[in-house]
A protein has these predicted regions:
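Solvent-exposed coil/turn segments that connect beta secondary-structure elements
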Residues: 15, 35, 51, 63-65, ...
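Short, well-structured beta-strand-loop connectors
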Residues: 37-46, 76-91
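Short glycine/threonine/proline-enriched tight-turn/helix- or strand-capping micro-motif at secondary-structure
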Residues: 9-40
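Soluble periplasmic/extracytoplasmic beta-strand elements of cell-envelope proteins
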Residues: 9-11, 27-29, 57-59, 68, ...
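Residue-level recognition of beta-strand microenvironments
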Residues: 13, 49-50, 91-94
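Conserved, short, structured surface segments that act as functional micro-motifs
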Residues: 58-61, 80-128
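Zn2+-dependent peptidoglycan hydrolase active-site motif and core
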Residues: 41-75, 100
Length: 128
């Protein structure tokens, strides 16, 4: 499910670094209005809701997959269970100045970042 609640325009795509320690864009930026409701992309448990480097962040564990949403003023707390589509907070200004956008990230395990857009569309399987 789109964390904006509806299909959103991708302002900046996923751009993984060539090496884990190099710079890159480990998520996608989605066009969204400041103050708009941000929803959980899937069922899971909130593992973090608070500030990281002066930016509000919500992180949700989906059983080995973790999604992050920023800058989001949380309406949830660590330990809360959420379903896909449940509100988790409101989008704050500051990420895509002068416009507003939601940075949505996804990772498997400790450091394997994936394109969160891949969570929206099931894999296509060709039948033989």
């Amino acid at each position: 499910m789109w964390p904006t609640g509806v299909k959103a325009t991708v302002v900046r795509p996923f751009d993984p670094p060539a090496r884990k320690w190099l710079s890159g864009h480990r998520g996608v930026d989605l066009d969204a209005p400041e103050g708009g409701t941000v929803v959980s992309a899937g069922a899971g448990t909130v593992v973090f809701a608070g500030k990281v480097a002066d930016k509000d962040v919500v992180s949700i564990d989906h059983g080995g997959l973790r999604t992050t949403y920023e800058p989001v003023r949380p309406s949830v707390s660590a330990g809360d269970k959420v379903k896909a589509g449940d509100p988790i907070g409101a989008l704050e200004a500051g990420h895509c100045v002068p416009a507003s956008c939601l940075h949505w990230g996804a990772r498997i395990g400790k450091d394997r970042y994936i394109d969160p857009l891949s969570l929206l569309y099931p894999a296509i399987r060709l039948l033989k």
